[in-house]
């Protein structure tokens, strides 16, 4: 069943694809399909939808591919590269199976660079950029989806069965407007806030505060198995970051 397959030169990614899979989710449920596949406009990203209409993002896809290779002794003692945004659930699940996992900065070019540096071949981003250097030299959504389908066929398993040992940690991401995020993140006040927030989270999760590379914003992400902790810390940190932005703006006048 095809969806959003009538391009006119202007409607690329318009209410469809990996960044807007809502219609696909409904179509999967309506047709009792086993799987939905959403690519982005240039085909280098892919997001999946299970039979219940739930999103399976790039983190879960990387886990599926890594485990399939591991179970068939094809990982060849290598590991997986993710980014600072990759869910902790991936890291913990892979390490439970003795699969090394390392993070790099956001961006498929950074994933590629880290793979080459480590001599590994599998990595990806939550957004659905998946790289398998055994199959292609860049992210390719079609190849990635075929590899997932192959894993389902070879293991005679549904997509949910392939993910039965994978637990995605609850997370929240907010973007806070800031004129010069690259400079703000370097300030003493921001560095102290990051250190304190990391200490407060402890081993219950992860705090990521970074400058956006594409927009004038500070990105704040909290990730924890304890949702109550996220709900408590998120508004507190948002308020503190906004206060620092206000104070720094006053100092620069």
Regions found by a protein language model. Give the residues of each.
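Phosphate-binding chemistry for phosphorylated carbohydrates and sugar-nucleotides
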Residues: 1-155, 168
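Mobile late-domain/C-terminal helix-loop "cap" segments
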Residues: 95-253
């Amino acid at each position: 069943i095809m969806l959003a397959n009538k391009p006119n030169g202007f409607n690329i990614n318009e209410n469809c694809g990996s960044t807007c899979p809502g219609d696909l989710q409904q179509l999967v449920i309506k047709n009792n399909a086993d799987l939905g596949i959403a690519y982005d406009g240039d085909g280098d990203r892919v997001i999946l939808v299970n039979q219940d209409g739930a999103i399976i993002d790039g983190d879960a896809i990387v886990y599926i591919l890594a485990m399939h290779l591991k179970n068939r002794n094809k990982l060849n003692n290598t590991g997986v590269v993710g980014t600072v945004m990759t869910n902790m659930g991936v890291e913990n699940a892979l390490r439970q199976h003795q699969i090394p996992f390392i993070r790099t900065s956001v961006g498929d070019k950074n994933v590629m660079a880290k793979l080459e540096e480590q001599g590994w071949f599998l990595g990806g981003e939550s957004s659905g950029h998946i790289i398998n250097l055994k199959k292609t030299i860049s992210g390719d959504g079609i190849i990635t989806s075929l590899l997932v389908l192959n894993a389902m066929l070879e293991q005679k398993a549904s997509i949910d069965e392939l993910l039965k040992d994978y637990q995605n940690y609850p997370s929240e991401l907010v973007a806070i407007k800031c004129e010069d995020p690259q400079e703000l993140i370097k300030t003493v006040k921001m560095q102290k806030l990051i250190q304190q927030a990391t200490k407060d989270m402890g081993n219950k999760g992860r705090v990521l505060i970074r400058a956006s590379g594409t927009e004038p914003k500070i990105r704040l992400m909290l990730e924890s198995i304890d949702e109550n902790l996220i709900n408590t810390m998120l508004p507190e940190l948002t308020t503190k970051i906004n206060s620092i932005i206000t104070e720094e703006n006053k100092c620069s006048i």
